[in-house]
Amino acid sequence: MHQIPTVGLGTWKASPGEVTDAVKVAINLGYRHFDCAYLYHNESEVGMGIKEKIKEGVVKRDELFIVSKLWCTYHKQSLVKTACINTLEALNLDYLDLYLIHWPMGFKPGDKDIPLDRSGKVIPSHTSFLDTWEAMEDLVIEGLVKNIGVSNFNHEQLDRLLNKPGLRIKPITNQIECHPYLNQKSLIDFCHGRNVSVTAYRPLGGSRDGVHLMDDIVIRKIAKKHGKSPAQILIRFQIQRNLIVIPKSVNPSRIRENIQVFDFELTEKDMEELLSLDKNLRLATFPSTENHKDYPFHIEY
């Protein structure tokens, strides 16, 4: 199993015009892990940045760890390989280091990423993520991807997958939203107890209902004490919990700042204070899919 680099560059909501440069800056600064997805509709631009840096000799392909995700409209077994090949072509790569099932929910196949009925609810596909997983395993066997994993799975869903009869390849990670306001302790303990790593997306929070994690008084106090930025504290917090972290930025100075997190350590008291901020505040709730049989957030974790 490949070791996933601890800090990666997230590319969600990075506009195509900005993301090529962001990737090039990141590679120059030492990033080797890049988190992509079909849904972000910017994979070809990410690929351009990677290709240029390989061509310049700054980095070799085997030094990079490139992740992408299978979108929900491709959960039918017969569509999984097509989706993966589309992503590989967009990124201009021969293989992915890691391919994730983006959400446990399958949607009706077609040209709409999120097919909705008249009442604004998602139209599901009649698929099971357990069947989808078999097609994911085939991708590893065929050499298109090196590792496979999941994203946004709750503990029951992950448990069902790990206990699937005839499981050939285990998921190596569960990529989930995680920050001090949603610290995910139960789910992380569950994953780590079963040798599944956890990758934290939205580690810097972002905003919903005007909630800005970076303005939190406790986080600012700890940042000041260490002479670091709030973002660096939020990233370091997850590293010390043995998580992989994928902060997103297209700003060169923030891309640099987000990886300068290995020259200091949070104290036990800092960690306790950060953990105590939990308020179960989920930002990525995907409300149009709440009707789906595999919606992951109806249970506690």
Curated annotation (Swiss-Prot):
Its main location: cytoplasm. It is found in: Cytoplasm. Substrate binds at residue 102. Disulfide bonds: none annotated. It catalyses: 1,5-anhydro-D-glucitol + NADP(+) = 1,5-anhydro-D-fructose + NADPH + H(+). It comes from the Eukaryota. Pfam families: Aldo_ket_red. PANTHER family: ALDO/KETO REDUCTASE. Monomer. This is 1,5-anhydro-D-fructose reductase. It comes from Rattus norvegicus (Rat).
